[in-house]
């Protein structure tokens, strides 16, 4: 992630930090989210040759809203079984698959996220990132509860 942080410095983003080797960054910028996404996508392609990288930028308020939007009854679940599939496009429409068709796993669609609960583990669920992308018709990236919580802590620091 050192190279990614150097890129952020070169682009004049402030206070850039990465979380582990997850590809997640927390930074300060005057750019709007969509502009930040396109700038990073272009620069990553130019500098590192990764033309198919999709960047998803959320504000502190946006990340807080995602966590706060977790279905209320899910707050009783084991947090290690909760995942957040962040969506590239806000307002993506969910397809026709019913959450009950995948029990004991379940999902709920939010504004820019699909919440996934998989009591038998993410490695065993059919509600993986590919499923979410087919369901919503947009790119997604999935993070577990622990990573999402740590990102919010980094943003709040």
Regions found by a protein language model. Give the residues of each.
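Surface-exposed, charge/polar-rich loops and edge strands
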Residues: 1-157
């Amino acid at each position: 992630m050192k190279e990614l942080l150097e890129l952020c410095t070169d682009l004049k983003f402030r206070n850039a930090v990465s979380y582990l080797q997850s590809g997640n960054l927390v930074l300060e910028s005057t750019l709007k989210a969509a502009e930040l996404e396109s700038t990073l996508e272009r620069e990553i392609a130019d500098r590192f040759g990764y033309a198919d990288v999709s960047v998803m930028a959320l504000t502190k308020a946006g990340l807080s809203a995602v966590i706060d939007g977790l279905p209320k009854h899910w707050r009783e679940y084991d947090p290690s079984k909760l995942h957040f599939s962040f969506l590239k496009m806000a307002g993506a429409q969910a397809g026709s698959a019913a959450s009950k068709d995948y029990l004991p796993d379940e999902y709920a669609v939010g504004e820019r996220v699909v919440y996934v609960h998989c009591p038998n583990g993410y490695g065993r669920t059919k509600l993986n990132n590919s499923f979410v992308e087919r369901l919503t018709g947009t790119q997604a990236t999935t993070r577990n509860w622990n990573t999402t919580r740590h990102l919010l802590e980094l943003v709040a620091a």
